Amino acid sequence: MSENSANELKYSRVLLKVSGEALMGDKGFGWDIETIDNLSHDLKEVHDLGVQLCLVVGGGNIFRGASASAPFGFERASNDYIGMLATMMNALSLQNSLEKINVQSRVLSAVSITAVCETYIRRRAIRHLEKGRIVICAAGVGNPFFTTDTAAALRGIEMGCNVIFKGTQVDGVYSADPKKVADAVRYDKISYRELLSLDLKIMDVAAVSLARDHSIPIIVFNLGKRGALADIICGGGLYTTIYN
């Protein structure tokens, strides 16, 4: 980033979707502390620029409700509630990692767990942002059958974010999985309509439709690359923009 990066910010309030898988590093389950701490340092870099930062965390590193129904024999709704609790565990892990480097944050849950964190209230969340705290949203939208991607779109819209960042393991949207298809084409930009028509499964249809209907762009980037988020916010970096 340049010395004048603070004056070159493209966005002032952003929503970052962090998948549960992004927190487990090379492990097959749970957390990788080094990975979480690296993410926290990247978040601090953005926070120190003066950007208001809201996170929505997934829970797939612990439990994935949509795919657990068959092997466990549980109802899908029950599975989704278990998944919401998994997102709470991830949110608290991130909060503790941020506190280690003196970054104030608040966990707000769509499901009331008052002994652990605050219940999500839109105005309260916005006030935390205005006070310079990172807001970490847990428990999705608080209802089963909705993904945390949909929660990210919803929170981004209702909290007035300029953009939704979708952190992945690659540096944008490709025509196919670049880890499996050597000649997969990477898009610098792609419209919501084209994304849906090509059935590129970056986010679920409900999330993409929400963002499209409210004209909020989605930026897909490599969350695992150190400093990538700050680079993009300051006008650089490698990513794909999904737009109307």
UniProtKB/Swiss-Prot annotation:
It holds the Pfam family AA_kinase. Pathway: Pyrimidine metabolism; CTP biosynthesis via de novo pathway; UDP from UMP (UMPK route): step 1/1. It catalyses: UMP + ATP = UDP + ADP. Residues 25-30 are annotated as: Involved in allosteric activation by GTP. Its EC number is 2.7.4.22. ATP binds at K17, V18, S19, G20, G60, R64, T168, Q169, Y174, D177. One of its GO terms (molecular function) is ATP binding. InterPro entries: AceGlu_kinase-like_sf, Asp/Glu/Uridylate_kinase, Uridylate_kinase, Uridylate_kinase_bac. One of its GO terms (cellular component) is cytosol. Keywords: Allosteric enzyme, ATP-binding, Cytoplasm, Kinase, Nucleotide-binding, Pyrimidine biosynthesis, Transferase. The keyword Cytoplasm applies. It is found in: Cytoplasm. The keyword Acyltransferase does not apply. Belongs to the UMP kinase family. NCBIfam families: pyrH_bact. Homohexamer. Catalyzes the reversible phosphorylation of UMP to UDP. This is Uridylate kinase. It comes from Ehrlichia ruminantium (strain Gardel).
